[in-house]
Amino acid sequence: MQDEALDIFDEKQNPLGVAGKAQAHRLGLWHYAFHCWLYRVVDAGTDVRLLFQQRGPDKALYPGLFDISAAGHYRAGEAVADGVREIEEELGVEIQFGDLVELGTRAEVFEAGNIISREFCRTFLGRTALDPAAFRPAEPEVTALVEVPVADGLAMCAGTWPTARCSGVRHWAGRWRQYESELSLRDLVPRPAAYYLDIFRHVEQASGGLRERADEPPGQ
């Protein structure tokens, strides 16, 4: 398989040229990534959910952990709007770039083994009417799609609750099956809790707000 070509930059986002993805990760070269969080309004004001994907077991970074709804690298020469191809590639649905809300660009550095990933992450928020079973995830790259109620996520990320409920679909024994569980921050790709809290707050605001918060943590 041919190595993907990426535009690379210095730490101040000045362009330096083009490198293969493997080289960029080996040398820790800065490049751009597309991050898109998708949410669904089940019942306005009371039931709003944020979509997470579970990373496949063969992922070089953080296999098995839950991550952004859809994300990936910008290829060399791509424009900002071209990042939406990641949604179709990973989730099997098409979303228009104009329907997304930009949340800003965040620098992320992850290191594992021989990989040094340095990314400028262009982050977006989008609304979907689809529940997890309606997506067509790219298995084995994605092994589960789950929704977390925003009220639960806010409580977990603020440290009020240890876990948040989640429900969706998981690939097991050759097919996609309904799945319900609980997630803690340890189940998510390691980012500051404040990052996830900020995303849940953006969803709460974009959806028009929550009239009430659940007052008991999962399992109670």
Predicted regions and their residues:
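Nudix hydrolase/Nudix homology domain
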Residues: 104-111, 115-220
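Acidic, metal-coordinating catalytic segment for phosphate/diphosphate chemistry
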Residues: 1-44
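Conserved Nudix-box catalytic region and its N-terminal flanking loop in Nudix hydrolases
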Residues: 23-35, 46-90, 160
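Residues that flank catalytic or metal-binding motifs in active/ligand-binding sites
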Residues: 4, 32-34, 70, 102, ...
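Short, solvent-exposed loop/turn segments that connect beta-strands within catalytic domains
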Residues: 41-48, 113
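A short coil-to-beta-strand element that immediately follows conserved catalytic motifs
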Residues: 94-104
